[in-house]
Amino acid sequence: MPELPEVETTRRGIEPHLVGQRVSRVLVRDRRLRWPIPEDLDVRLSGQRIEAVERRAKYLLIRAESGTLIVHLGMSGSLRLVDAASPAAKHEHVDILLESGQALRYTDPRRFGAMLWSDEPLAHVLLASLGPEPLGEDFDGDRLYRLSRGRSMAVKPFIMDNAVVVGVGNIYASEALFAAGIDPRRPAGSISRARYLKLGEEIRRILAMAIERGGTTLRDFVGGDGKPGYFQQELFVYGRGGEFCKSCGSTLREIRLGQRASVYCSRCQR
């Protein structure tokens, strides 16, 4: 699933090609995403000038003159710029045609993504209750410490809760906990403030590094230019169960936490 760095990489890739452009047409080949694409999307977006391309959590907000297109990439979605005349392949469900002769093409093999229209996107039910951005000024380890008091749930699903902080998915939660030396199974309420301060720093550092590397390409993700990300080369634990720890050489363990695979080092993480 594309996580925050992959979505931000996509935003940075498509923004220069969209802002200031006018939409000439929206071609929808298949409306059946996680929620059906609005039947009037072509009417709403055609003729509109695109004013900004923003991100909130894992949602892309393509702001036009009279509203905003909310896009979620789901499990396997991607957005990239193509020549408007290029034929669509299987799973390429939507083209937003631009006056420049390019098209913003949405591909989603598993169709778990979304394209929705909103006049007030930040008040939309999908975005209104989200926590702070992990790279913003409202997030730090103190917030994690405060919200964790009295919580018995494991720390990994705690930091993956979008009400606590957005965009810390399975890949980056695993990597941040390893970097901070925290066992992902440890109860959130049992972790000291000092360790949470370290964890907050590692979340910010690792997400920033992943964005710089263009995200993590594990299966379907490509950036807005169609190129893969390279952060997978930096992974210490995610997807490496049974392999050796790059820090101490012991065997990494794989467990299930909150219905997700979690890999950790029993020697480095306490």
From Swiss-Prot:
GO terms for molecular function: 8-oxo-7,8-dihydroguanine DNA N-glycosylase activity; class I DNA-(apurinic or apyrimidinic site) endonuclease activity; damaged DNA binding; zinc ion binding. DNA binds at residues 91, 110, 151. Binds 1 zinc ion per subunit. PROSITE patterns: FPG_CAT, ZF_FPG_1, ZF_FPG_2. It catalyses: Hydrolysis of DNA containing ring-opened 7-methylguanine residues, releasing 2,6-diamino-4-hydroxy-5-(N-methyl)formamidopyrimidine; 2'-deoxyribonucleotide-(2'-deoxyribose 5'-phosphate)-2'-deoxyribonucleotide-DNA = a 3'-end 2'-deoxyribonucleotide-(2,3-dehydro-2,3-deoxyribose 5'-phosphate)-DNA + a 5'-end 5'-phospho-2'-deoxyribonucleoside-DNA + H(+). Its cofactor is Zn(2+). GO terms for biological process: base-excision repair. Transmembrane segments: none annotated. The active site is at residues 2-3, 58, 260. Keywords: DNA damage, DNA repair, DNA-binding, Glycosidase, Hydrolase, Lyase, Metal-binding, Multifunctional enzyme, Zinc, Zinc-finger. It holds the Pfam family Fapy_DNA_glyco. Gene3D superfamilies: 1.10.8.50, MutM-like, N-terminal. InterPro entries: DNA_glyclase/AP_lyase_DNA-bd, DNA_glyclase_Znf_dom_DNA_BS, Formamido-pyr_DNA_Glyclase, FPG_cat, MutM-like_N-ter, Ribosomal_uS13-like_H2TH, Znf_DNA_glyclase/AP_lyase, Znf_FPG/IleRS. A zinc finger (FPG-type) spans 236-270. Belongs to the FPG family. Involved in base excision repair of DNA damaged by oxidation or by mutagenic agents. Acts as a DNA glycosylase that recognizes and removes damaged bases. Has a preference for oxidized purines, such as 7,8-dihydro-8-oxoguanine (8-oxoG). Has AP (apurinic/apyrimidinic) lyase activity and introduces nicks in the DNA strand. Cleaves the DNA backbone by beta-delta elimination to generate a single-strand break at the site of the removed base with both 3'- and 5'-phosphates. PANTHER family: FORMAMIDOPYRIMIDINE-DNA GLYCOSYLASE. Monomer. This is Formamidopyrimidine-DNA glycosylase. It comes from Stutzerimonas stutzeri (strain A1501) (Pseudomonas stutzeri).
